[in-house]
Amino acid sequence: MSSSAQNEIVACHLGRVSYERARALQERVQERLIAAKRAEPPEPEPHVLLLLEHPPVYTLGKSGDAANLLVSEERLEEVGATFHRIGRGGDVTFHGPGQLVGYPLFDLDRFFTDLGRYLRTLEEAIIRTCADYGVTGTRVDGRTGVWVGPDDRGPERKICAMGVRCSRWVTMHGFALNVTTDLDYFDHIVPCGIDDRGVTSLAAETDAPGTVDDVCGPVTEHFGALFDAEVTTRHGDDARSFLRGLTGERVEAPGR
């Protein structure tokens, strides 16, 4: 067993990727991690953290209520968005430009086999990232994700949504941190099925939110620290080449 692969996370900073392509990538990496742990002897692959942006898309989790999508799918097409029903936990949410989406493909057998602890660790990575930008992120009892407030700006509001799926302790799906997101897109849904709280972004909470690319750095650093793992970061074409070699899936560069 390779000790380097045992505790290595490859963070792939990909830029903008379609939801369909990112989902296919997740499935292929998850399949590869599961196959590696079934091998005799096990041959652990590195864990993978996909960091990217999506074009406008709404997703509904397997336990979600379609009534929380407040407009028709035809109306979403009119505003340039798509809609997908998917297998993660959680309700309806939005992904789009200005939002950092993170998909950890981790074999929790090599960290800890506790899904609640895993979610709290994801939250902690985002709380620490928010703090890097002068924003105090918090948890809310009974609700997954990272929140801001209540404070003089208003009541509790969600800055980062989370929803995960796990198969044989290998994770997929993950988190969506609003950086400079156009929050008007959330007017078309009841975000995460919670109708008594709003949403926010780093840009709404601070004068210096950075860009999505900027925020990838601290997120990657905090993942390495919290999972006690060695992190290798790959950007752009290097990340796409790595993933194509790993999965056979082609990842188009933004704008191509």
Swiss-Prot record:
**What does the UniProt entry say about where the protein is found?**
Cytoplasm
For whether the record's keyword set contains Nucleus, the answer is no
The active site is formed by C192
| Gene3D superfamilies per the UniProt record, alphabetical | Bira Bifunctional Protein, Domain 2
- The Enzyme Commission number assigned here is 2.3.1.181
One Pfam family assigned to this protein is: LplA-B_cat
Q: Which reaction does it catalyse?
A: octanoyl-[ACP] + L-lysyl-[protein] = N(6)-octanoyl-L-lysyl-[protein] + holo-[ACP] + H(+)
Q: Which NCBIfam families does the entry mention? A: lipB (TIGR00214), PRK14345.1 (NF010925)
Q: Which family does it belong to?
A: Belongs to the LipB family.
Quote the record's miscellaneous comment: In the reaction, the free carboxyl group of octanoic acid is attached via an amide linkage to the epsilon-amino group of a specific lysine residue of lipoyl domains of lipoate-dependent enzymes.
The protein, known as: Octanoyltransferase
Originating species = Salinibacter ruber (strain DSM 13855 / M31)
